[in-house]
A protein has these predicted regions:
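Cytoplasmic membrane-interface "Motif A"-like loop-to-helix N-cap segments
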Residues: 66-80, 294-308, 327
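C-terminal transmembrane helical hairpin of 12-TM major facilitator-type secondary transporters
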Residues: 300-347
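Transmembrane alpha-helices of Major Facilitator/SLC transporters
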Residues: 52-57, 270-294, 305, 309-312, ...
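Intracellular loop-helix junctions on the cytosolic face of multi-pass helical membrane proteins
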Residues: 1-5, 38, 82, 92, ...
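Transmembrane alpha-helix termini and helix-breaking/packing motifs in multi-pass membrane transporters
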Residues: 62, 89, 148-170, 291, ...
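Helix-loop boundary and gating motifs at the non-cytosolic
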Residues: 2-54, 230-260
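Helix-to-loop junctions at the C-terminal end of transmembrane segments
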Residues: 56-69, 284-301, 387-388
Length: 424
Protein backbone atom coordinates (compact mmCIF):
# COMPACT_ATOMS: atom_id res chain seq x y z
CA UNK A 1 0.00 0.00 0.00
CA UNK A 2 1.65 3.24 -1.13
CA UNK A 3 1.86 6.35 1.01
CA UNK A 4 -0.61 8.87 -0.42
CA UNK A 5 -0.97 11.10 2.63
CA UNK A 6 0.63 14.00 0.76
CA UNK A 7 -1.82 15.32 -1.88
CA UNK A 8 1.00 17.25 -3.56
CA UNK A 9 2.10 13.95 -5.07
CA UNK A 10 -0.96 13.75 -7.28
CA UNK A 11 -3.11 16.90 -7.04
CA UNK A 12 -0.95 19.26 -9.17
CA UNK A 13 -0.48 16.70 -11.95
CA UNK A 14 -4.18 15.74 -11.82
CA UNK A 15 -5.31 19.31 -12.48
CA UNK A 16 -2.58 19.84 -15.04
CA UNK A 17 -3.94 16.76 -16.82
CA UNK A 18 -7.47 18.09 -16.44
CA UNK A 19 -6.64 21.34 -18.22
CA UNK A 20 -4.28 20.15 -20.94
CA UNK A 21 -6.56 18.02 -23.16
CA UNK A 22 -9.49 20.41 -22.64
CA UNK A 23 -7.54 23.32 -24.12
CA UNK A 24 -6.25 21.08 -26.90
CA UNK A 25 -9.84 20.18 -27.76
CA UNK A 26 -11.29 23.68 -27.64
CA UNK A 27 -8.40 25.87 -28.84
CA UNK A 28 -5.49 23.94 -30.33
CA UNK A 29 -7.79 21.89 -32.57
CA UNK A 30 -9.09 25.16 -34.03
CA UNK A 31 -5.56 26.26 -34.95
CA UNK A 32 -4.76 22.79 -36.27
CA UNK A 33 -7.75 22.54 -38.62
CA UNK A 34 -7.26 26.10 -39.85
CA UNK A 35 -3.69 25.25 -40.79
CA UNK A 36 -4.91 22.08 -42.49
CA UNK A 37 -6.84 24.29 -44.92
CA UNK A 38 -10.42 24.02 -43.68
CA UNK A 39 -12.68 27.03 -44.08
CA UNK A 40 -13.68 29.10 -41.07
CA UNK A 41 -17.22 27.72 -41.27
CA UNK A 42 -15.95 24.14 -41.21
CA UNK A 43 -13.45 24.75 -38.41
CA UNK A 44 -15.98 26.46 -36.13
CA UNK A 45 -18.73 23.93 -36.85
CA UNK A 46 -16.62 20.81 -36.37
CA UNK A 47 -14.72 21.90 -33.26
CA UNK A 48 -17.81 23.29 -31.51
CA UNK A 49 -19.22 19.78 -31.36
CA UNK A 50 -16.52 18.97 -28.80
CA UNK A 51 -18.66 20.82 -26.22
CA UNK A 52 -21.42 18.21 -26.54
CA UNK A 53 -20.25 15.94 -23.65
CA UNK A 54 -20.57 18.92 -21.29
CA UNK A 55 -24.03 19.74 -22.67
CA UNK A 56 -25.08 16.13 -22.01
CA UNK A 57 -23.55 16.15 -18.54
CA UNK A 58 -26.89 15.92 -16.66
CA UNK A 59 -27.54 12.56 -18.35
CA UNK A 60 -24.34 10.86 -17.22
CA UNK A 61 -22.85 12.83 -14.33
CA UNK A 62 -24.99 11.34 -11.51
CA UNK A 63 -24.03 7.79 -12.49
CA UNK A 64 -20.25 8.06 -12.70
CA UNK A 65 -19.69 7.34 -9.01
CA UNK A 66 -22.39 4.65 -9.02
CA UNK A 67 -20.60 2.55 -11.63
CA UNK A 68 -17.05 2.73 -10.28
CA UNK A 69 -14.73 4.76 -8.06
CA UNK A 70 -13.41 8.14 -9.10
CA UNK A 71 -9.88 6.74 -9.17
CA UNK A 72 -10.96 4.05 -11.62
CA UNK A 73 -12.61 6.63 -13.90
CA UNK A 74 -9.58 8.91 -13.77
CA UNK A 75 -7.17 6.17 -14.79
CA UNK A 76 -9.51 4.83 -17.49
CA UNK A 77 -10.14 8.21 -19.08
CA UNK A 78 -6.48 9.24 -18.88
CA UNK A 79 -5.28 6.24 -20.85
CA UNK A 80 -8.06 6.77 -23.41
CA UNK A 81 -7.13 10.45 -23.80
CA UNK A 82 -3.43 9.64 -24.09
CA UNK A 83 -4.08 6.91 -26.65
CA UNK A 84 -6.44 9.20 -28.58
CA UNK A 85 -3.79 11.92 -28.85
CA UNK A 86 -1.26 9.36 -30.06
CA UNK A 87 -3.73 8.05 -32.62
CA UNK A 88 -4.41 11.60 -33.82
CA UNK A 89 -0.66 12.02 -34.30
CA UNK A 90 -0.61 8.85 -36.40
CA UNK A 91 -3.49 9.97 -38.65
CA UNK A 92 -2.51 13.62 -39.28
CA UNK A 93 -0.01 12.94 -42.11
CA UNK A 94 -2.45 10.49 -43.76
CA UNK A 95 -4.97 11.15 -46.56
CA UNK A 96 -7.92 10.51 -44.19
CA UNK A 97 -6.64 12.86 -41.48
CA UNK A 98 -9.82 14.94 -41.16
CA UNK A 99 -12.31 12.13 -40.61
CA UNK A 100 -10.00 10.11 -38.38
CA UNK A 101 -8.83 13.02 -36.24
CA UNK A 102 -12.37 14.31 -35.73
CA UNK A 103 -13.52 10.87 -34.57
CA UNK A 104 -10.56 10.61 -32.19
CA UNK A 105 -11.09 14.14 -30.86
CA UNK A 106 -14.71 13.12 -30.28
CA UNK A 107 -13.58 10.14 -28.19
CA UNK A 108 -11.15 12.36 -26.30
CA UNK A 109 -13.84 14.96 -25.60
CA UNK A 110 -16.13 12.47 -23.86
CA UNK A 111 -13.20 11.04 -21.92
CA UNK A 112 -12.11 14.56 -20.96
CA UNK A 113 -15.58 15.40 -19.64
CA UNK A 114 -15.67 12.21 -17.55
CA UNK A 115 -12.15 12.92 -16.30
CA UNK A 116 -13.11 16.47 -15.25
CA UNK A 117 -16.03 15.23 -13.18
CA UNK A 118 -14.00 12.46 -11.57
CA UNK A 119 -11.05 14.76 -10.80
CA UNK A 120 -13.28 17.34 -9.12
CA UNK A 121 -15.07 14.61 -7.18
CA UNK A 122 -11.80 13.09 -5.98
CA UNK A 123 -10.54 16.53 -4.96
CA UNK A 124 -13.65 17.11 -2.82
CA UNK A 125 -13.56 13.60 -1.35
CA UNK A 126 -9.88 13.67 -0.41
CA UNK A 127 -9.27 17.33 0.41
CA UNK A 128 -12.47 18.37 2.15
CA UNK A 129 -12.59 21.90 3.59
CA UNK A 130 -8.82 22.51 3.50
CA UNK A 131 -7.05 25.87 3.55
CA UNK A 132 -6.71 28.10 0.52
CA UNK A 133 -3.22 26.85 -0.36
CA UNK A 134 -4.60 23.60 -1.77
CA UNK A 135 -7.16 25.48 -3.87
CA UNK A 136 -4.43 27.85 -5.08
CA UNK A 137 -2.25 24.92 -6.17
CA UNK A 138 -5.16 23.31 -7.99
CA UNK A 139 -6.04 26.52 -9.85
CA UNK A 140 -2.41 27.35 -10.65
CA UNK A 141 -1.72 24.03 -12.32
CA UNK A 142 -4.94 24.21 -14.31
CA UNK A 143 -3.91 27.66 -15.60
CA UNK A 144 -0.41 26.36 -16.27
CA UNK A 145 -1.92 23.64 -18.45
CA UNK A 146 -3.76 26.33 -20.42
CA UNK A 147 -0.49 28.18 -20.95
CA UNK A 148 1.32 25.02 -22.07
CA UNK A 149 -1.42 23.88 -24.47
CA UNK A 150 -2.39 27.22 -26.01
CA UNK A 151 1.08 28.72 -25.85
CA UNK A 152 3.93 26.24 -25.90
CA UNK A 153 2.33 23.47 -28.00
CA UNK A 154 1.31 25.92 -30.73
CA UNK A 155 4.75 27.57 -30.66
CA UNK A 156 6.45 24.18 -30.97
CA UNK A 157 4.21 23.30 -33.91
CA UNK A 158 5.23 26.57 -35.59
CA UNK A 159 8.93 25.93 -35.03
CA UNK A 160 8.62 22.42 -36.42
CA UNK A 161 6.90 23.83 -39.51
CA UNK A 162 9.94 26.03 -40.07
CA UNK A 163 12.29 23.06 -39.62
CA UNK A 164 10.28 20.82 -41.94
CA UNK A 165 9.54 23.55 -44.50
CA UNK A 166 5.85 24.00 -43.84
CA UNK A 167 4.88 20.35 -43.50
CA UNK A 168 1.72 20.97 -41.46
CA UNK A 169 0.61 17.39 -40.99
CA UNK A 170 4.01 16.04 -39.99
CA UNK A 171 4.77 18.97 -37.67
CA UNK A 172 1.48 18.66 -35.82
CA UNK A 173 1.92 14.89 -35.74
CA UNK A 174 5.17 15.29 -33.80
CA UNK A 175 3.45 17.67 -31.37
CA UNK A 176 0.65 15.19 -30.69
CA UNK A 177 3.10 12.30 -30.30
CA UNK A 178 4.90 14.31 -27.63
CA UNK A 179 1.61 15.24 -25.98
CA UNK A 180 0.50 11.60 -25.97
CA UNK A 181 3.76 10.48 -24.39
CA UNK A 182 3.46 13.07 -21.63
CA UNK A 183 -0.17 12.17 -20.90
CA UNK A 184 0.61 8.45 -20.72
CA UNK A 185 3.53 9.06 -18.36
CA UNK A 186 1.22 11.14 -16.17
CA UNK A 187 -1.28 8.27 -16.25
CA UNK A 188 1.41 5.94 -14.88
CA UNK A 189 2.24 8.50 -12.17
CA UNK A 190 -1.40 8.72 -11.14
CA UNK A 191 -1.70 4.94 -11.10
CA UNK A 192 1.00 4.92 -8.43
CA UNK A 193 0.05 7.93 -6.32
CA UNK A 194 -3.70 8.59 -6.55
CA UNK A 195 -5.09 7.11 -3.33
CA UNK A 196 -7.18 3.97 -3.17
CA UNK A 197 -10.42 4.66 -1.32
CA UNK A 198 -12.37 1.45 -2.00
CA UNK A 199 -12.48 -1.43 -4.48
CA UNK A 200 -13.07 -0.18 -8.02
CA UNK A 201 -16.51 -1.80 -8.39
CA UNK A 202 -17.61 -1.93 -4.78
CA UNK A 203 -21.06 -0.54 -5.61
CA UNK A 204 -21.50 -1.53 -9.23
CA UNK A 205 -24.84 -0.17 -10.41
CA UNK A 206 -25.40 0.47 -14.10
CA UNK A 207 -28.70 2.31 -14.62
CA UNK A 208 -30.96 1.63 -17.58
CA UNK A 209 -31.91 4.25 -20.14
CA UNK A 210 -35.43 4.56 -18.72
CA UNK A 211 -34.05 5.19 -15.23
CA UNK A 212 -31.60 7.79 -16.52
CA UNK A 213 -34.25 9.67 -18.49
CA UNK A 214 -36.65 9.49 -15.55
CA UNK A 215 -34.18 10.94 -13.06
CA UNK A 216 -33.05 13.68 -15.45
CA UNK A 217 -36.69 14.52 -16.16
CA UNK A 218 -37.48 14.79 -12.43
CA UNK A 219 -34.41 16.97 -11.82
CA UNK A 220 -35.31 19.25 -14.72
CA UNK A 221 -38.92 19.60 -13.57
CA UNK A 222 -37.82 20.58 -10.07
CA UNK A 223 -35.34 23.05 -11.55
CA UNK A 224 -38.02 24.82 -13.57
CA UNK A 225 -40.37 24.88 -10.57
CA UNK A 226 -37.97 27.24 -8.84
CA UNK A 227 -39.23 30.84 -8.79
CA UNK A 228 -37.95 32.81 -11.79
CA UNK A 229 -36.40 29.69 -13.32
CA UNK A 230 -37.23 30.93 -16.82
CA UNK A 231 -35.42 34.21 -16.15
CA UNK A 232 -32.41 32.32 -14.79
CA UNK A 233 -32.33 29.98 -17.80
CA UNK A 234 -32.47 32.91 -20.22
CA UNK A 235 -29.57 34.45 -18.31
CA UNK A 236 -27.53 31.25 -18.57
CA UNK A 237 -28.14 30.99 -22.31
CA UNK A 238 -27.73 34.65 -23.31
CA UNK A 239 -25.23 36.24 -20.92
CA UNK A 240 -22.23 34.82 -22.79
CA UNK A 241 -23.61 35.16 -26.32
CA UNK A 242 -20.88 37.61 -27.45
CA UNK A 243 -18.21 35.28 -26.09
CA UNK A 244 -19.85 32.30 -27.80
CA UNK A 245 -19.64 34.10 -31.14
CA UNK A 246 -16.03 35.13 -30.50
CA UNK A 247 -14.73 31.86 -29.07
CA UNK A 248 -13.74 30.36 -32.43
CA UNK A 249 -13.61 33.37 -34.75
CA UNK A 250 -11.21 35.32 -32.52
CA UNK A 251 -8.68 32.49 -32.91
CA UNK A 252 -9.24 32.31 -36.66
CA UNK A 253 -8.93 36.09 -37.01
CA UNK A 254 -5.53 36.12 -35.33
CA UNK A 255 -4.04 33.42 -37.60
CA UNK A 256 -5.94 34.03 -40.86
CA UNK A 257 -4.05 35.68 -43.70
CA UNK A 258 -4.23 39.43 -44.30
CA UNK A 259 -5.79 38.83 -47.73
CA UNK A 260 -8.78 37.32 -45.89
CA UNK A 261 -8.98 40.14 -43.35
CA UNK A 262 -7.03 38.39 -40.58
CA UNK A 263 -3.88 39.45 -38.77
CA UNK A 264 -1.79 36.61 -40.18
CA UNK A 265 0.02 35.70 -36.97
CA UNK A 266 2.40 32.77 -37.18
CA UNK A 267 1.86 29.88 -34.73
CA UNK A 268 4.75 31.22 -32.66
CA UNK A 269 3.19 34.69 -32.53
CA UNK A 270 -0.23 33.24 -31.75
CA UNK A 271 1.23 31.17 -28.91
CA UNK A 272 2.81 34.30 -27.46
CA UNK A 273 -0.26 36.53 -27.86
CA UNK A 274 -3.10 34.16 -26.95
CA UNK A 275 -1.31 31.40 -25.06
CA UNK A 276 0.86 33.60 -22.87
CA UNK A 277 -0.42 37.18 -22.73
CA UNK A 278 -4.07 36.15 -23.14
CA UNK A 279 -3.91 33.44 -20.47
CA UNK A 280 -2.27 35.91 -18.08
CA UNK A 281 -5.11 38.36 -18.73
CA UNK A 282 -7.75 35.69 -18.19
CA UNK A 283 -6.16 34.65 -14.89
CA UNK A 284 -5.88 38.25 -13.70
CA UNK A 285 -9.51 38.95 -14.59
CA UNK A 286 -10.67 35.86 -12.72
CA UNK A 287 -8.71 36.82 -9.59
CA UNK A 288 -10.05 40.38 -9.63
CA UNK A 289 -13.60 39.11 -10.21
CA UNK A 290 -13.43 36.66 -7.32
CA UNK A 291 -12.13 39.37 -4.96
CA UNK A 292 -14.83 41.80 -6.09
CA UNK A 293 -17.63 39.28 -5.47
CA UNK A 294 -16.15 38.33 -2.10
CA UNK A 295 -16.15 41.94 -0.91
CA UNK A 296 -19.24 43.39 -2.58
CA UNK A 297 -21.52 40.49 -3.49
CA UNK A 298 -22.86 39.47 -6.87
CA UNK A 299 -25.75 41.94 -6.97
CA UNK A 300 -23.43 44.89 -6.61
CA UNK A 301 -20.97 43.68 -9.24
CA UNK A 302 -23.30 42.12 -11.81
CA UNK A 303 -23.59 45.21 -14.01
CA UNK A 304 -19.86 46.07 -13.97
CA UNK A 305 -19.07 42.45 -14.79
CA UNK A 306 -21.62 42.34 -17.60
CA UNK A 307 -20.03 45.43 -19.12
CA UNK A 308 -16.54 43.99 -18.70
CA UNK A 309 -17.68 40.91 -20.59
CA UNK A 310 -18.91 42.94 -23.57
CA UNK A 311 -17.10 46.28 -23.97
CA UNK A 312 -13.55 44.82 -24.30
CA UNK A 313 -14.75 42.88 -27.36
CA UNK A 314 -14.33 46.18 -29.18
CA UNK A 315 -10.60 45.38 -29.15
CA UNK A 316 -11.15 42.94 -32.01
CA UNK A 317 -13.09 45.54 -33.97
CA UNK A 318 -10.17 47.92 -33.49
CA UNK A 319 -7.73 45.27 -34.72
CA UNK A 320 -9.89 44.53 -37.78
CA UNK A 321 -9.91 48.23 -38.74
CA UNK A 322 -6.27 49.15 -38.16
CA UNK A 323 -4.60 45.74 -38.77
CA UNK A 324 -1.51 46.62 -36.69
CA UNK A 325 1.83 45.00 -37.47
CA UNK A 326 3.08 45.64 -33.95
CA UNK A 327 2.76 42.43 -31.94
CA UNK A 328 2.72 44.48 -28.72
CA UNK A 329 -0.50 46.24 -29.78
CA UNK A 330 -2.12 42.93 -30.73
CA UNK A 331 -1.06 41.40 -27.43
CA UNK A 332 -2.38 44.37 -25.48
CA UNK A 333 -5.79 44.13 -27.19
CA UNK A 334 -6.03 40.40 -26.51
CA UNK A 335 -4.91 40.96 -22.91
CA UNK A 336 -7.60 43.59 -22.28
CA UNK A 337 -10.32 41.42 -23.84
CA UNK A 338 -9.28 38.42 -21.74
CA UNK A 339 -9.11 40.44 -18.52
CA UNK A 340 -12.65 41.63 -19.20
CA UNK A 341 -13.87 38.12 -19.97
CA UNK A 342 -12.20 36.63 -16.88
CA UNK A 343 -13.67 39.36 -14.68
CA UNK A 344 -17.18 39.04 -16.13
CA UNK A 345 -17.24 35.25 -16.16
CA UNK A 346 -17.09 35.19 -12.36
CA UNK A 347 -20.55 36.79 -12.23
CA UNK A 348 -21.92 34.07 -14.50
CA UNK A 349 -20.62 31.23 -12.32
CA UNK A 350 -21.67 32.91 -9.07
CA UNK A 351 -25.20 33.54 -10.33
CA UNK A 352 -25.61 29.87 -11.23
CA UNK A 353 -24.35 28.79 -7.81
CA UNK A 354 -26.63 31.29 -6.06
CA UNK A 355 -29.70 30.28 -8.05
CA UNK A 356 -29.37 26.50 -7.55
CA UNK A 357 -28.88 26.69 -3.77
CA UNK A 358 -31.31 24.46 -1.92
CA UNK A 359 -32.81 21.06 -2.58
CA UNK A 360 -30.93 19.02 -5.23
CA UNK A 361 -28.40 21.83 -5.58
CA UNK A 362 -25.70 19.51 -6.99
CA UNK A 363 -27.97 18.14 -9.71
CA UNK A 364 -29.24 21.61 -10.53
CA UNK A 365 -25.68 22.96 -10.63
CA UNK A 366 -24.87 20.28 -13.20
CA UNK A 367 -27.89 21.37 -15.23
CA UNK A 368 -26.80 25.00 -15.00
CA UNK A 369 -23.33 24.13 -16.25
CA UNK A 370 -24.89 22.21 -19.13
CA UNK A 371 -26.73 25.40 -20.10
CA UNK A 372 -23.38 27.19 -19.87
CA UNK A 373 -21.79 24.75 -22.34
CA UNK A 374 -24.81 25.05 -24.63
CA UNK A 375 -24.57 28.85 -24.53
CA UNK A 376 -21.08 28.59 -26.06
CA UNK A 377 -21.62 25.59 -28.33
CA UNK A 378 -24.59 26.88 -30.35
CA UNK A 379 -23.31 30.36 -31.30
CA UNK A 380 -19.80 28.98 -31.86
CA UNK A 381 -21.10 26.35 -34.29
CA UNK A 382 -22.51 28.96 -36.65
CA UNK A 383 -20.05 31.78 -36.02
CA UNK A 384 -17.80 30.62 -38.84
CA UNK A 385 -20.65 30.66 -41.36
CA UNK A 386 -21.61 34.16 -40.23
CA UNK A 387 -18.04 35.44 -40.44
CA UNK A 388 -17.57 34.05 -43.94
CA UNK A 389 -20.79 35.72 -45.05
CA UNK A 390 -20.00 39.22 -43.75
CA UNK A 391 -16.24 39.39 -43.15
CA UNK A 392 -14.31 39.90 -39.94
CA UNK A 393 -15.01 43.60 -39.47
CA UNK A 394 -18.78 43.33 -39.82
CA UNK A 395 -18.73 40.16 -37.73
CA UNK A 396 -17.11 41.99 -34.82
CA UNK A 397 -19.74 44.74 -35.13
CA UNK A 398 -22.40 42.02 -34.87
CA UNK A 399 -20.65 40.67 -31.77
CA UNK A 400 -20.83 44.09 -30.14
CA UNK A 401 -24.51 44.38 -31.08
CA UNK A 402 -25.14 40.97 -29.50
CA UNK A 403 -24.20 42.60 -26.20
CA UNK A 404 -27.87 43.58 -26.07
CA UNK A 405 -28.54 39.94 -25.18
CA UNK A 406 -26.09 40.24 -22.28
CA UNK A 407 -27.84 43.39 -21.05
CA UNK A 408 -31.26 41.70 -21.19
CA UNK A 409 -29.85 38.66 -19.38
CA UNK A 410 -28.36 40.91 -16.68
CA UNK A 411 -31.69 42.66 -16.08
CA UNK A 412 -33.41 39.29 -15.68
CA UNK A 413 -30.68 38.09 -13.32
CA UNK A 414 -31.06 41.16 -11.10
CA UNK A 415 -34.83 40.64 -10.95
CA UNK A 416 -34.21 37.02 -9.97
CA UNK A 417 -31.67 37.91 -7.27
CA UNK A 418 -33.93 40.59 -5.77
CA UNK A 419 -36.86 38.17 -5.67
CA UNK A 420 -34.65 35.54 -4.01
CA UNK A 421 -33.56 38.04 -1.35
CA UNK A 422 -37.16 39.15 -0.74
CA UNK A 423 -38.19 35.56 0.05
CA UNK A 424 -35.57 35.19 2.80
Amino acid sequence: MQNTDNPLRWLPSLYFFKGLPYVVLMVVSTVLYKQMGLSNAEVAFYTSWFYLPWVLKPFWHPYVSRIATRRWWILLTEIIIGASMGSIAFTLPSPFNLQASLALFWVASFSCAFHNVSADGLYLDEMGPRHNLIYFIRTTFYRLATFVAQGILVMVAGNLQVMYRGSMGYSWSLVFYGLSLFLLLTWIWHGIFIPYTQPAFKQLSIPGIRQVLGEVSDTTKLFFRKPYAIYATIFMLLFKLPEGLLSKVSILFLIDGAHRGGLGLSPQEYGLVAGTIGVAGLSLGGILGAKAIAHGGIKRWLWPMALSLTIPNAAYLYLSYYMPDNIFIVGLCVFLEQVGYGFGFVAYIMFIKRFVMGYLHKAHLTLGKAFMALSIMLPAMFSGFLQQAVGYRTFFIIVLCSSIATIIATILAIITLKAKEARK
